[in-house]
């Protein structure tokens, strides 16, 4: 038993080996001379070590009543600030607040403890109250709100680390600022190293706050070594996986509370779906929530798949500047008529991440209702089945618009890529759609605002053969009339389509067609 106890004490104290030198060398950054007086337990004599840090030192006998060591710094003229109480308190609070050794400031023979001398993340979760977690969250985040989620764990294996992370209940005002960084602090053996460790957590988790304490990194690790450290890369991967899993559990067990989180941080989380290959994409997709054309509240992709119609092969979505603009889009008419759910995306990041999702989700591709052919004819609902005649053929109420299409093409020329009969329109006379393979119109709008593209690309104009206006124009064309109103009508339809598309910032001489 004595040997086992001695071995445990040696293991515990082995972490102290080499700790002194790191801080000691830094003393010469602010001191022109350093004296160390030390007396070993059991010996009468003490020794003074003195150096100016320029490569030479002296050792001589000294007097010291008690055992131990004392270090005296003779500060440089430009380092007198380190004699100020406030400066000392700030430094200790920032870097050594949680080390096990208490740090005491003595002033006028009165002692004041400057650090907590304990680290909450080293304790068992069962020994920590929610109030204590909240207090530490407010300390580490400089906030006053309650943590929406707390995640505390210790990992042991190829490398050991502890993590205590929080998701705020309120969104920071600078969450979308270009210079915004994550707020996770890196500690090594309870000593603060940096709160600006690139790659410690991914940018799309920059709302997460807390600490990660690594046991296996050296205290004097540099910023360059941190950026290239394989251990930190592995820790980052593990931490990201853990946080996403915790969010998934929260979403499944408390969906109402998850809605609150999504409204605060959903747009940031979706950033992880765009850009470089991400091994966590599937986990992120399971966390994404959408507004829908057929339901109130938010829906997940699993909810969407469960409600797909017979014959539906794609996950349909539409992007736009705002939810109000999207809901009034004519592109939704045909889908609404068949009861097909369309996901409504209005965050600026949506156009970027969803256009890069070539692999889709659960073998279903993402398809924009503003691009290509709608393929609605392959999806049937109860109304479609009731509209079939005895031979199984659908009754046709469409008007032959081929002559009108030719007339409109002649008028619009290269202003449009093509003119087609629409199967996605039920109420509106016309709309613009992007051809398959072309850039989505809302994405083009965003890029034009940032001067990333020049003029708007020509689009496909679709006309609704069941609309009274189109029927009237078809009659005029069939009657062989050369009425100038046909040309004006074509230009008016095109302008109306551009207004509804909200992707064109100007109209060509609109005053000529204002009545």
Residue ranges and their predicted role:
Residues 12-113:
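GHKL-type ATPase core
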């Amino acid at each position: 038993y004595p040997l086992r106890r001695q071995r445990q004490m040696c293991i515990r104290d082995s972490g102290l080996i080499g700790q002194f030198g790191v801080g000691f060398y830094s003393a010469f950054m602010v001191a022109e001379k350093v004296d160390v007086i030390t007396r070993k337990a059991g010996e009468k004599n003490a020794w003074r070590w003195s150096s100016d840090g320029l490569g030479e030192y002296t050792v001589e006998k000294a007097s010291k009543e008690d055992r131990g060591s004392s270090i005296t710094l003779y500060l440089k003229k430009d380092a007198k600030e380190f004699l100020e109480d406030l400066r000392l308190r700030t430094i200790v609070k920032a870097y050594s607040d949680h080390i096990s050794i208490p740090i005491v400031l003595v002033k006028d023979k009165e002692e004041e403890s400057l650090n907590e001398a304990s680290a909450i993340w080293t304790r068992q979760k069962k020994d920590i109250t929610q109030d204590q977690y909240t207090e530490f969250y407010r300390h580490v985040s400089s906030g006053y709100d309650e943590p929406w989620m707390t995640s505390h764990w210790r990992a042991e294996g190829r490398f050991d680390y502890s993590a205590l992370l929080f998701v705020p209940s309120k969104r920071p005002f600078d969450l979308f600022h270009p210079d915004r960084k994550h707020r996770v602090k890196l500690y090594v053996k309870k000593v603060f190293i940096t709160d600006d460790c690139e790659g410690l957590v991914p940018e799309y988790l920059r709302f997460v706050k807390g600490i990660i304490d690594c046991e296996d990194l050296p205290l004097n690790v540099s910023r360059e070594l941190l950026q290239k450290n394989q251990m930190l890369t592995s820790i980052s991967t593990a931490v990201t996986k853990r946080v996403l899993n915790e969010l998934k559990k929260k979403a499944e067990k408390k969906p109402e509370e998850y809605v609150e989180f999504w409204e605060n941080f959903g747009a940031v989380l979706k950033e992880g779906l765009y850009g470089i290959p991400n091994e966590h994409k599937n986990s992120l997709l399971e966390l994404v929530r959408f507004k829908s054309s057929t339901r109130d509240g938010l829906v997940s992709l699993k909810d969407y798949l469960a409600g797909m119609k017979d014959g539906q092969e794609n996950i349909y979505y539409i992007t736009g500047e705002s939810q109000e603009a999207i809901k009034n889009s004519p592109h939704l008419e045909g889908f609404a008529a068949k009861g097909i759910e369309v996901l409504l995306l209005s965050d600026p990041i949506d156009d970027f991440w969803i256009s890069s999702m070539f692999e889709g989700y659960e073998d279903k591709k993402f398809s924009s209702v503003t691009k290509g052919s709608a393929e609605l004819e392959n999806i049937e609902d109860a109304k479609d089945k009731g509209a079939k005649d005895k031979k199984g053929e659908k009754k046709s109420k469409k008007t032959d618009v081929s002559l009108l299409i030719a007339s409109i093409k002649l008028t619009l020329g290269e202003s449009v890529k093509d003119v087609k009969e629409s199967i996605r329109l039920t109420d509106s006379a016309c709309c613009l759609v992007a051809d398959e393979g072309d850039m989505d119109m809302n994405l083009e709008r965003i890029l034009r605002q940032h001067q990333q593209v020049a003029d708007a690309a020509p689009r496909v104009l679709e006309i609704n053969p069941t609309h009274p206006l189109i029927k009237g124009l078809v009659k005029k064309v069939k009657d062989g009339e050369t009425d100038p109103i046909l040309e004006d009508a074509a230009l008016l339809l095109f302008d109306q389509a551009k207004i509804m598309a909200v992707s064109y910032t100007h109209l060509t001489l609109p005053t000529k067609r204002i009545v």
